[in-house]
Curated annotation (Swiss-Prot):
Function in brief: Catalyzes the conversion of L-lactate to pyruvate. Is coupled to the respiratory chain.
Matching InterPro entries: Aldolase_TIM, Alpha-hydoxy_acid_DH_FMN, FMN-dep_DH, FMN_HAD, FMN_hydac_DH_AS, LldD
Residues that coordinate or bind substrate: 24, 129, 164, 278
Family, as annotated: Belongs to the FMN-dependent alpha-hydroxy acid dehydrogenase family.
Gene name in the database record: lldD
Keywords: Cell inner membrane, Cell membrane, Flavoprotein, FMN, Membrane, Oxidoreductase
Source species of the chain: Salmonella paratyphi B (strain ATCC BAA-1250 / SPB7)
EC main group: oxidoreductase
Residues forming the catalytic site: 275 (proton acceptor)
Name by which UniProt lists this protein: L-lactate dehydrogenase
FMN hydroxy acid dehydrogenase domain residues: 1-380
Chain positions recorded as FMN binding sites: 106, 127, 155, 251, 306-330
Chain coiled-coil ranges: none
EC number: 1.1.-.-
């Protein structure tokens, strides 16, 4: 299969992966309305073309949390990444490191912190949930700090798992799930050999290290179901500050008031995110939520964004809407499943090229020059309020 654009990796991944794994990353919550709107709303953001601007000295480099990034992109935390390629977290981290951007390790990764961190030169980021087992949280924070992780990404939009109906149909959950997954693996020999046989152990490394025993897929589902904490509040974040003195990013913000609360708390950054449409169907897409949030807190806190980003043009759109940096999730996982480290590296090269084209044709020589002025309202169309530039009074 020819890979000429970032979007080609999705089709390639669907051929390679057993259905239970493909649909686990490809699907969303309920009827997947928000999942679709994440992509559709972002694709409708029109950019303002500018010409004759002498773009010979264009640069994508930016700075975030005292780190220099080759472009305003980081790899998002993705659970079970090591099931998509052999020791997938290690491969994805290596590709990000070579590109000069951060890799974020998920709490529920296959490869533990201690396996991934020593393989890369730049400090890794670590993602953590608020869980009932505070002993695990403290253990994870201490291990992340000992491994040299620089930034904590704290996910707050998952006090309970979303209703992901596609998982029951694909074999990730539901009746006879284990047997269905087994036969799917048999029918996908490339994955079965590379990951199923040679990618072991298939446990959740960070959790296994704490519990002192392997945690397989069924354990993963059960452990998460029992440990997500609906009582989560800002007080829990205050407790975490006792064990983490580095940059802290709050992931899962969709409302300007929550963004202001993050500033008042003293967070270093937020991620405008609806969890890729995997939690609550019917909420705003990140593209629609971002402008009002940026209007409320831009300059007071670093603003990251995810959900719906599939290519370099989408990165430029998100920055024009108010983000400082974006996180890639599904896009890099499709590439990882297709060709491992090389696939992720190629995806990042494609995104870089697409960003350069978009910036050249919009007259933005640097990331700081991408702003609301880079957007244009299309003739005959009214831009939705949440995508339109807003004044401070409008955002209140």
């Amino acid at each position: 299969m020819i890979i000429s654009a970032a979007s080609d990796y999705r089709a390639a991944a669907q051929r390679t992966l057993p259905p239970f794994l493909f649909h686990y990353i490809d699907g969303g919550a309920y009827a997947e309305y928000t999942l679709r709107r994440n992509v559709e709303d972002l694709s409708q953001v029109a950019l303002r073309q500018r010409v004759l601007k002498n773009m010979s000295d264009l640069s994508l480099e930016t700075t975030l949390f005292n780190e220099t990034l080759s472009m305003p992109v980081a790899l998002a935390p993705v659970g079970l990444c090591g099931m998509y390629a052999r020791r997938g977290e290690v491969q994805a981290a290596a590709a990000a490191d070579a590109k000069g951007i951060p890799f974020t390790l998920s709490t529920v990764s296959v490869c533990p912190i201690e396996e991934v961190a020593p393989t890369i030169k730049r400090p890794m980021w670590f993602q953590l949930y608020v869980l009932r087992d505070r002993g695990f949280m403290r253990n994870a924070l201490e291990r992340a700090k000992a491994a040299g992780c620089s930034t904590l990404v704290f996910t707050v939009d998952m006090p309970t798992p979303g209703a992901r109906y596609r998982d029951a149909h694909s074999g990730m959950s539901g009746p006879n799930a284990a047997m269905r997954r087994y036969w799917q693996a048999v029918m996908h020999p490339k994955w079965a050999w590379d990951v199923g046989l040679n990618g072991r152990p298939h446990d959740l490394g960070n959790i296994s290290a704490y519990l002192g025993k392997p945690t397989g897929l069924e354990d993963y589902i059960g452990w998460l179901a029992n440990n997500f904490d609906p009582s989560i509040s800002w007080k829990d974040l205050e407790w975490i500050r006792e064990f983490w003195d580095g940059p802290m990013v709050i992931k899962g913000i969709l409302d300007p008031e929550d963004a202001r609360d993050a500033v008042r708390f003293g967070a270093d950054g937020i991620v405008v995110s609806n969890h890729g449409g995997r939690q609550l169907d019917g909420v705003l897409s990140s593209a629609r939520a971002l402008p009002a949030i940026a209007d409320a807190v831009k300059g007071d806190i670093a603003i990251l964004a995810d959900s719906g980003i599939r290519n370099g043009l989408d990165v430029v759109r998100m920055i024009a809407l108010g983000a400082d940096t974006v996180l890639l999730g599904r896009a890099y996982l499709y590439a990882l499943a297709t060709a491992g480290k090389a696939g992720v590296a190629n995806l990042l090269d494609l995104i870089e090229k697409e960003m350069k084209v978009a910036m050249t044709l919009t007259g933005a020589k640097s990331i700081s020059e991408i702003s609301g002025d880079s957007l244009v309202q299309e003739l005959g169309k009214s831009l939705p309020t949440a995508l339109a530039p807003m004044s401070k009074g409008d955002a209140a």
